[in-house]
C-alpha cells in the first residue's frame, strides 16, 4: 500500500455552482493510461488537446480540453491531468466519477490503470506541491490567501508572497544566523587556537544587523497580517449619538435605518469597507444604556450583543453627541461606557454632529490638538455632512499600526508574526550573551539555534505534522 501522500488523488478544482468552464484535476504517478482511457488517445505533454471525454462504453460525457503535465514540471511535482469541461455541477461530477472508475479498470497491460486513486482532501494538491519542494510553506499559505483576498492590496501582497519575496528574506536571515553560529561553534571547538573567530567576524556587528533586519521584517509582517485579517471595528455609544449615520458615511451607502427615535438599532449591522486597501469590518451596534433605561427586552438583548461585539473588537469608535456633551448626566454616561471598555482595545473618541454644534466642536478640536502622547485618539466630525470622515479613516489606520504602502507588503499570518517575534527575542538574548565572557558562548550558540528554528517554521524547513494539517485543512478541495 502506498503512503497517503503518494496515493493518486482527484477532485473538481473549480468552485461549486454553474459556470462556463469547470476543471477536474488528477495528480499521481503514471497517468498516461488513465488519460488515454478518458480521451481515447495519447496526450502530448503540456499541449492542450480538444475532444470528447469518454464514458466506459465510449460515449461522450462532454467535450473539452485535456492537458497532461508530466512530473516534475507540474503544480504538485507529480504527473497532473486536467480536464476542462463545461462548468455544470452534474457534468463535473460525472467526469470525476469516470476518473475514479477508469482508474480501477484493467488496462492493456493487465493491471489497473491507476490503482488507489481517491478523492482529494482540502488543500491536498498544494500539500503535494509543498512535499515535493515546488513551494515552501509560506508560499503554500499564500495560495489560500490569494484565493481568499478581499481587497486588491491583499491580493497583490499574497501574489508577492507566492512568488517567494517573503521566503527569500527569511532564508537570508537564516543563512546569517547559520554563518554566525558556525563561528561560535568553531570558537567552542578549538579553544586552544589563538584565533578569536567572533572578534574577527565582527559578531557584535552581525548580531546588530540581524536584529535590525528582523525588526524591519517583523514590522512588514504585521502590515501583511493586517491586510489578510483586516480590522474589526465596533461603533459604540449612547442611543442617538449617530452610530448608524457613521456606518452609512463610512460605507458610502444607506445600510442602516436612521431616525431620531432612540433605540432604532436593535441588533448589530456589519459591513466590510476598504481603507487604503486594508479590509475594515465595521459593526454598528445598539445604543448603550442601562437595563432600567432600555425600552423593552428586545433592546436589552441588543445591548448585550453590543458589549459582546466590543469584547471581540480590535478597535472601538466611541461616539459622543456634541449637542449634548455639555450635559453632566450625558457626559457621565459616556465616561461610564469608556471605563467599561476592554483595556487592550484600540479606542478612538468620535465627537459627532459638528455641523449642529460648531462652537462645541471647535472647543473639542482644540482640546484634542493639545492632547498628550498616550491619550486616546479623537476625531471631530459630522456623519451627516461627512466632514471629518477622512480624518477618522486615517485615525483608524494609525490605531491599527498601518503605515506601509501596500506595494511593499507581502501577505503574512499571525503565526508568521509570532515566529518572527520569537526569533527577534532570541537574537536579543544572543546579543546579551555576546557581551559576556567566553564562558557564555554555549548559551550564545543556543540562542542562535533557537532563532534559526523559529524562522524555519515559517517556510516549513522545520514543521510539525499538526501544523501542516491545520494549514492545508483550511484550503478548498481541489487546490
Curated annotation (Swiss-Prot):
GTP binds at residues 240-245, 259-265, 284-287, 352-355, 382-384. Mg(2+) binds at residues 244, 265. Pfam families: MMR_HSR1, MnmE_helical, TrmE_N. It is found in: Cytoplasm. K(+) binds at residues 240, 259, 261, 264. SUPFAM superfamilies: P-loop containing nucleoside triphosphate hydrolases (SSF52540), TrmE connector domain (SSF116878). InterPro entries: G_TrmE, GTP-bd, GTP-bd_TrmE_N, GTPase_MnmE, MnmE_dom2, MnmE_helical, P-loop_NTPase, Small_GTP-bd. The keyword Magnesium applies. (6S)-5-formyl-5,6,7,8-tetrahydrofolate binds at residues 25, 82, 134, 479. Binds 1 potassium ion per subunit. Keywords: Cytoplasm, GTP-binding, Hydrolase, Magnesium, Metal-binding, Nucleotide-binding, Potassium, tRNA processing. Exhibits a very high intrinsic GTPase hydrolysis rate. Involved in the addition of a carboxymethylaminomethyl (cmnm) group at the wobble position (U34) of certain tRNAs, forming tRNA-cmnm(5)s(2)U34. This is tRNA modification GTPase MnmE. It comes from Leptothrix cholodnii (strain ATCC 51168 / LMG 8142 / SP-6).
